[in-house]
From Swiss-Prot:
Family recorded in the similarity comment: In the central section; belongs to the AAA ATPase family.
Binding residues for Zn(2+): 465, 469, 543
Cofactor info, note text: Binds 1 zinc ion per subunit.
GO molecular-function terms, A-Z: ATP binding; ATP hydrolysis activity; ATP-dependent peptidase activity; metalloendopeptidase activity; zinc ion binding
Residue segments, region Disordered: 165-184
Protein's name in the database: ATP-dependent zinc metalloprotease FtsH
NCBIfam families in alphabetical order: FtsH_fam (TIGR01241)
Cofactor requirement: Zn(2+)
Top-level taxonomic group: Eukaryota
Protein's membrane topology: Multi-pass membrane protein
Transmembrane regions listed in the UniProt entry: 13-33, 136-156
Residue intervals on the Lumenal side: 34-135
Amino acid sequence: MNKKETNTSWWRIILISLGISIICILAAFLAMKDGFFVLENNTKNNNPDSPENKASSKMAYARLLNYIEKGWIKTIDFYENGQIAIVEASSSELSDRPQRLRVEIPAGSTSLIGKLKEANVDINAHPPKLDIFKTISDTLGSLIVPGLVVAVFYLFLERANNNNNNNSNGSPFGPGGGPNQNMRGLGEIKKEIQKEPDTGITFKDIAGIEEVKEEFEEIVTFLKDPSRFTAVGATIPKGVLLVGPPGTGKTLLAKAIAGEAKVPFINISGSEFVEMFVGVGAARVRNLFEKAKQDTPCIIFIDEIDAVGRQRGAGVGGGNDEREQTLNQLLTEMDGFEKNKGIVVIAATNRADILDNALLRPGRFDRQVTVNPPDRAGRVAILAVHARNKKLSPAISLETIAQRTTGFGGAELANLLNEAAIISAREEKAEIGSKEISLAIERVIAGLEGPSIADNKNKRLVAYHEAGHAMVGTLLRNHDNVQNVTLVPRGQARGLTWFMPNEDPSLVTRGQIVARIVGALGGRAAEQSVFGSTEITTGASGDLAQVTDLAKQMILRFGMSGIGPVSLSKPGGSFLFVGRGVRPSNEYSEALAIKIDEQIRTITELCYNEAVEIMDLNRISLDLAVTGLIQDEVLTGVSFEKVVADFSKLPTNKIYESKFPKK
């Protein structure tokens, strides 16, 4: 925009401001009630037909009603829409001389006309004369507030549009030439398609999820050499949905596809579609696919698609809100009346359970790829990728780190090595050692390290509590192995006991669940066995919540109780408006609920008694372990097992099935 156009735009703003100022000045002039009302009063005084000039004396309305009852009123003339009346009264009691009096008629005097007719009074009505000046002033007065609101809103939109357009040429209306152009821009996607995307990520940077990587390598091959697949009648998948917990590499996979395919690529978040203005989301979806059609083959990546793809009609009454309109448009664009050839939509979410069924069907998202946390071999491969630019000590084994980080995803493993590097730099070490790795693992799992426990009594209580957990984990065959026991406070915990969980958490036996319940109750059992029931602390509150949840799942989900092999809970649990709607919390009778409560109590009591028995039978081992723990504040699982092995038989396990009643 040249200098002349810029000056013209500024003149437009000045004229708008001047118009608003004139309206405000006029409003202030009318509010003063000086010039106008003086002029109006002078006009009325000079007008012989005005009510003020018809009668000089006033009379109260109550007195008027009294005169009507006595028959003294002969004629009455109404002025100003019946608000003022001029009456002519005559009577012998009034000196037989007619009097003309002015009366102000109150609002709501509906019975006056009837009384006048009964008294045979001559009634005359005079229509109000049009006061042009007053009409204009009333009209302007009624337009002042709406005009100011419109003007302020107009200027607000211009300022917002100028900020969004990042205008550098000095024009107040931006390069679009005005607010109308910018308002139309609300339905446009601001991000441009990357013709040759350079994300810096390729499939060489992806590790630990080889099966998933193979799926996407096939899509990349299809985009590069479609004839290889079309020769046998195959068509490219229209959509791929990545599902998995946070931090497992879903977004990283999309970056790798963009870096490998070398085709136009555009990425957008699901939350960018929905705005406060109705219809903007659907317009942005249309604009997105219009851009993609201009550069086919093309890849569209929608991150966190659950922000716009939630189940329609959720909640009470459903509703056709902005999110549903956006979803409907997305469904149409992906597989509607018009076909989109050469456009591959890749989406990622960690809440696939709340997505709309129409979005998940073949033809839209042909493939649903689950990205789970990596296994041990996958973690080793991921650690090798992230350790490329880290100076690790030769004594460090990635296999050992992978063994200690069961359940970690790619993002957590990357953060782990980064935390270890930060700790090494803080201690001014040239390389990352085993100590830094251990501290980083503890920091990622439990949080920042807190000050040591100074009070000897509390330290001893915490030591017995944590040793109780570790004792059960060491002695029970079905329990996870002890990894570490520490008295160093981290986060809100005064002490911690780590276990090495099973590599496949999806397959857990009944004995493993029961052993975990006994292990969780081991801390409280140690407190009772050593200090007595009066010295039981509140430190086991989190353990009790975990125990109750495990016992409840044994009964409701897995059929591992005396109630029998039944499942009393549906997948997804009880939800309220979270993408699906309403579901009652309990889907069984009250009588069965009582039995469930009894079973929960039975399981927890039997497991707690077992934990107390373990502490009583292995008191010497427990005391020795606590002595070493208080002295060193940290014991590894191997060190703890050596202490226990001198005075306890490893492992000890009982048949729990016989303890649970069938009825």
